[in-house]
Each structure stands twice: as C-alpha cells, then as structure tokens.
Amino acid sequence: MLVSIITPFFNEEQTLAILLERVAAAALPAGMTREFVLVDDGSRDGSNAIAAEFVGRHPDAARLLSLPSNQGKGAAMRRGMSAAKGDIILIQDADLEWDPADYARLLAPYVDPAVSVVFGSRLLGHEAKRIYYHYYLGGRMLSAWTNLLFGSHVTDEPTGMKSFRRGVLDGITLGADGFDFDPELVARLLQAGHTIHEIPVRYQPRTFKEGKKVRPRDGLRALWVLLQIRLQGKQRRA
C-alpha cells in the first residue's frame, strides 16, 4: 500500500530540511511504502532549493511541484493531491509542529478496510502543549461546532495531521485556496458520510516569531466555512 505524503510549503527554509529527513526516517506499518509529494507555494526564500536537493537524493520516491505564486495551502494541497499516486493521502505541514514519528500509529487503522479517514489529535492521550491559549480554546470551539453541525465526535478539527484513503476524494469537490482548506475538507468528508477516526499525536507549537502563519481570523473563517457547507447540503455529481 502506497502512502502519498504531501507537504505544502511557503518560505519554510528554517524547518524544511529537518522535516524532510524526519519524514524519510519515519517508520510505517508493515506493507506500506511512501512517496514524497512536495509542493512549493511560491516561496521566495531558499525552500525550493532545499526541496530540490531532497528530491535529487530520492529521485524514485519524491517529486517537487511548484506553484507560480503564493496561492495558499488549499491550492497547494489540490495540486499535490492531483499528482499523488498513493492509496492513502497523508498531509504533513512543513513547520515541525507535527511529528512524523507518529505515522506508524496514524496509519495502523487502515488495516481495517472499513476505515477511510484517520486524523491525529492533540487532545487524546497527551497533555496538549500550547503557547497561545486562545488558539487552544479556538480549536476546542471549532471541534464543538463541527460536531454540532455534522453529528460527529472529533476532538481536534484543526489538526494539521490528516490522512484519508484516496478514494474518498472521488465523492467530493474541494475549492478553498487558503487555510480554509482544512475545515472544507473536514466538512466535505463528514457530509459524504465518512467517519473520522482519531489517534493521539504529539504536537510542538511554534511562535509567530518562529514563523507561525495561522491567525485568529483563520479560525473565524473556519467557523463560517463549516456552517456554509452544512447549509449547502450534500454535493451532487452530474
């Protein structure tokens, strides 16, 4: 079973090289192999060169895709997903907040063919680390809002460690360009009837000085996206 690890990045030269080495070294469950799909979202620093050097060392397993300008996480993810060849898609942000050492546990549930979506949760089994308390509260609010709207039981809706079988994309359309990609993905998956399984993962938050990009307004936008999709109802395919 092939796992496509998609890493969108924008100006992450301080963390990208370390992250990619950790992704390459991370253990996977027996019977799983990996491909690296790196998507440069218009970086203006040395990130592209770092990614290109990594691809040069892993030519059979890694690809670098580049957007002509900074278009946002959602645009980068759609580009990466369209190129991915794996049976499972795994989203790995480039900021070192999410530990690839958790891959084995994140992917283990896929031995059950009935499991289609697995997220990593910061709130299961570990004391959630936090630097900005309002982000912690915002995450709890987003999770509660998601559960209210869709009848789900997620504990960490805004988690940056998401995975799903490639086939789930056949029934949904994603159009968000920015960080609203995440709530859009969650809402569409739940709306399509998929159960989101969660496993505990580690989390090392970074500060704005260290390059954190998500802002409080993105949380407010996420609340609206979730509600908007709930009100729209299920997508219909022609």
How would you describe each model-predicted region?
Residues 2-4, 35, 184:
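Cell-envelope/extracellular polymer assembly enzymes that use nucleotide-activated donors
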Residues 12-27:
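Short, well-formed alpha-helical segments that are part of the catalytic scaffolds
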Residues 14-18, 45-54:
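Acidic helix N-cap motif at the loop->helix transition within catalytic regions
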Residues 34-38, 48-83:
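Conserved donor nucleotide-binding strand/loop of the catalytic core
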Residues 40-49, 96:
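A conserved acidic beta->alpha catalytic loop
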Residues 67-83, 88, 100-179, 205-225, ...:
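Acceptor/aglycone-binding surface of glycosyltransferases and processive sugar-polymer synthases
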Residues 153, 174-177, 186-204:
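Catalytic donor-sugar/metal-binding loop of nucleotide-sugar-dependent glycosyltransferases
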